[in-house]
């Protein structure tokens, strides 16, 4: 099923990327995960890094800090990653996050 969706995305012009599974605090803050979702994220104190709660965090940070040339704004990226997060509320307790 994963390959089916990735193939469809690539056919629609998206480029598949393999993002990292660990991000720094700036990356998590820049995508709105911190401070709002801090209690749901896994933090590795020794390395000062967070496990990604969703692929969106590293994918949206790929061009962070870059100045893109005029007319070069149409990057279409997709990626598949494991997602590491504590499930909040009763939704996660009942299905253990398997539906997400």
Where are these regions (language model features)?
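TRNA-recognition modules of translation machinery and tRNA-sensing kinases, especially anticodon-binding
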Residues: 2-100
């Amino acid at each position: 099923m994963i390959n089916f969706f990735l193939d469809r995305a690539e056919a629609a012009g998206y480029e598949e990327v393999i993002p990292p599974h660990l991000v720094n605090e700036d990356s998590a803050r820049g995508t709105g995960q911190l401070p709002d979702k801090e209690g749901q994220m896994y933090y590795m104190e020794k390395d000062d890094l967070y496990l990604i709660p969703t692929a969106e965090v590293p994918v949206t940070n790929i061009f962070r800090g870059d100045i893109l040339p005029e007319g070069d704004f149409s990057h279409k990226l997709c990626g598949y990653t494991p997602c590491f997060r504590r499930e909040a509320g009763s939704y996660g307790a009942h299905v253990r996050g398997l539906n997400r």
